[in-house]
């Protein structure tokens, strides 16, 4: 038996000791670094045709937030398809997913050593380990037998960790794979304490029938939380129906919620199911529920109390089995005190309240999220790599993010577009000059348009143009004072939310 395998047998006991899952993964990669003398390595989970980093060594922290599509990364696709050890020629022209992301090497990886170890359980791919060295001859003496041993050991460790997670968080669920419940489509990025607590709470409530009230500032990801609750529940195979209460005109609100029959009102040319019926057997997500009128709140309360609805114009009652997840950026118990929200409805909705922390309280998650969005925009722009400069990483951590995760997403995407325009290269680095995050204004705010709207209205324009210019100026000022919150802006301007959205589109604000 080779000395390398002997070394691995020696540390197997440490890997299987009572460490946390993350500590086991980190120990695995540290051992790979020490034994193979590599510059970087990563342990990846395979989900939804993507590789998700679980642990890294020698790579920038932002890598943990990235999700690598095998369709867009030929090296990772080769590892996923091979079924055995993959050694890439040192002069391979295939782009490396870690270009610019190895901590002790700046820029594109040219000639270097690269090995991929697929992690298989019963011939099914569950993950991979990637190993890179800047020395093109670093791994020449390694035998495939030795690498297969490492791969088998890592596959067993990863499989055990996934089974333990399934037992801990999904014990009451049916037998389908936990990976089917928790996929990239509803993944919540973040390792901060606040987000770990939130994930635990989602797992606890997902498979119950309790109504959930998701609370948090604009842009924190409340819809993503609702999505996760639905997809981790027994209702995942049925519909998740979305309704933005803030953009719901009062005139059609009842029909949108409960449906109508033919002839119920002018324009009702056929029967139509409302959101409650569309979500029957599934979940209805009521976003910005705090914007509902008191009259509509009373009708919603009745549906929740009795589990049936009436279509507009119909005398019949229709039973529905619909779970409610609601979200708001208002402090609803304060709204109850102010008489703007019904106390009985508040208690019905908030059986299980969840709070999504703002990004300023999640400093350690900022770079993970930045990496996630950088990988997204890389694929959309057709680039080989998008990386964050060290100085930019420091700036992102220090900024207070009034627009939360949504602001970060917009900032990264806008910066990538600017960086691409700055250079013809397919490998770009985002630098401080690509970002405009010096002021507390959210990127949701159309600042250029706001600046233009500040100019005095000229006397030589027509009444309609002058009226439009004044309305635009007023809306932009209200948006800025409310940090981009459209619902709060509608309240300040004393407008119906739906009418405000339509007016904003006509004026070119949205």
From Swiss-Prot:
Residues 188-417 form the Sigma-54 factor interaction domain. ATP binds at residues 216-223, 279-288. GO terms for molecular function: ATP binding; ATP hydrolysis activity; DNA binding; DNA-binding transcription factor activity. The keyword Nucleotide-binding applies. GO terms for biological process: phosphorelay signal transduction system. Pathway: Nitrogen metabolism; nitric oxide reduction. This is Anaerobic nitric oxide reductase transcription regulator NorR. It comes from Vibrio vulnificus (strain CMCP6). The gene is norR.
């Amino acid at each position: 038996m080779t000395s390398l395998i002997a070394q691995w047998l020696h540390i197997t006991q440490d890997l299987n000791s009572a460490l946390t899952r993350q500590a086991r993964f980190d120990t695995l990669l540290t051992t790979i670094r020490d034994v193979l003398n590599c510059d970087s390595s990563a342990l990846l989970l395979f989900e939804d045709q993507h590789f998700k980093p679980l642990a890294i060594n020698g790579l920038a922290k932002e890598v943990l937030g990235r999700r690598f599509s095998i369709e867009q990364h030929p090296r990772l696709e080769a590892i996923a398809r091979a079924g055995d050890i993959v050694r890439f020629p040192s002069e391979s022209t295939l782009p490396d997913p870690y270009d610019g992301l190895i901590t002790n090497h700046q820029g594109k990886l040219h000639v270097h050593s690269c090995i991929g170890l697929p992690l298989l359980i019963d011939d099914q791919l569950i993950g991979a380990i990637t190993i890179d060295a800047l020395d093109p001859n670093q791994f020449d003496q390694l035998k495939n037998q030795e690498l297969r041993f490492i791969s088998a050991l890592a596959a067993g460790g990863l499989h055990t960790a996934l089974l333990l997670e399934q037992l801990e968080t999904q014990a009451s669920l049916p037998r389908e794979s936990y990976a089917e419940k928790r996929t990239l489509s509803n993944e919540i990025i973040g390792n901060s304490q606040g987000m770990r607590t939130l994930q635990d709470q989602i797992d606890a409530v997902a498979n119950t029938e309790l109504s959930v009230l998701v609370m948090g500032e604009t842009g924190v990801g409340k819809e993503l939380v609702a999505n996760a609750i639905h997809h981790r529940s027994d209702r995942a195979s049925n519909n998740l129906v979305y309704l933005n209460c803030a953009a719901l005109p009062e005139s059609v609100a009842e029909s949108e919620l409960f449906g109508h029959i033919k002839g119920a009102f002018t324009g009702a040319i056929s029967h139509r199911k409302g959101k409650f019926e569309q979500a029957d057997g599934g979940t209805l997500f009521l976003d910005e529920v705090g914007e509902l009128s008191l009259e509509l709140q009373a009708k919603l309360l009745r549906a929740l109390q009795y589990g049936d609805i009436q279509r507009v114009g119909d005398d019949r009652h229709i039973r529905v089995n619909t779970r409610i997840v609601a979200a708001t950026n208002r402090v609803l118990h304060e709204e109850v005190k102010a008489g703007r929200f019904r106390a009985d409805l508040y208690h019905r909705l908030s059986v299980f309240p969840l709070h999504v922390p703002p990004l300023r309280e999640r400093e350690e998650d900022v770079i993970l999220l930045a990496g996630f969005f950088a990988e997204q925009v890389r694929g959309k722009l057709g680039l080989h790599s998008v990386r964050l400069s060290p100085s930019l990483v420091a700036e992102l951590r220090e900024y207070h993010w009034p627009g939360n995760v949504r602001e970060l997403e917009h900032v990264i995407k806008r910066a990538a577009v600017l960086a691409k325009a700055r250079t013809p290269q397919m490998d770009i680095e985002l630098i401080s000059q690509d970002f405009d995050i010096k002021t507390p204004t959210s990127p949701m705010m159309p600042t250029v348009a706001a600046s233009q709207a500040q100019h005095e209205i000229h006397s030589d324009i027509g009444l309609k143009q002058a009226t439009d210019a004044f309305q635009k100026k007023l809306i932009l000022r209200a948006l800025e004072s409310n940090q981009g919150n459209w619902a709060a802006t509608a309240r300040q301007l004393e407008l119906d939310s739906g009418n405000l959205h339509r007016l904003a589109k006509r004026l070119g604000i949205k």
